[in-house]
Amino acid sequence: MTSEVVIDVQQKDISIALMEDKQLVEYQNEPREASFSVGNIYIAKVKKLMPGLNACFVDVGYERDAFLHYLDLGSHFNSYQKYLKQVQSDRKKLFPFSKASKMPELEKDGSIQNVLKAGQEVLVQIVKEPISTKGPRLTGEISFAGRYLVLMPFGDKVSEIGRA
């Protein structure tokens, strides 16, 4: 069985279709508005490194820069970065995730300036919405929540969601 996600971005709305063996399985249509909701995934640009905080500020398109701490990069950050480069190298051709290679895990006690630099593009997900004068809070550990499971690319564990 082959699965395919088709995303159509128009000026006023975004349509997402899930196809399995060329048959439509699921379809969603959402209005396109500039809301920064928890779970949204962006390719963002590092604006400013803050070595004292071991963090950085990242531009995701919001009026204020988002905050990304080193510990929130996630252990598979290097794998995401390599995959992002491979996908961006030829945007006309789909790079299958099955061909992505897993990189060594990020050190837990490392420094943000050894991993990121200003102007670098990173794949991030919003974990906390903007509040008052603060921008969104980000993570580099991407996850896709479904009805019965949560997909974490490059992850080694399999866990199920239990409902009582």
Can you say where each PLM-predicted feature lies in the sequence?
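Single-stranded RNA-binding surfaces
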Residues: M1-R163
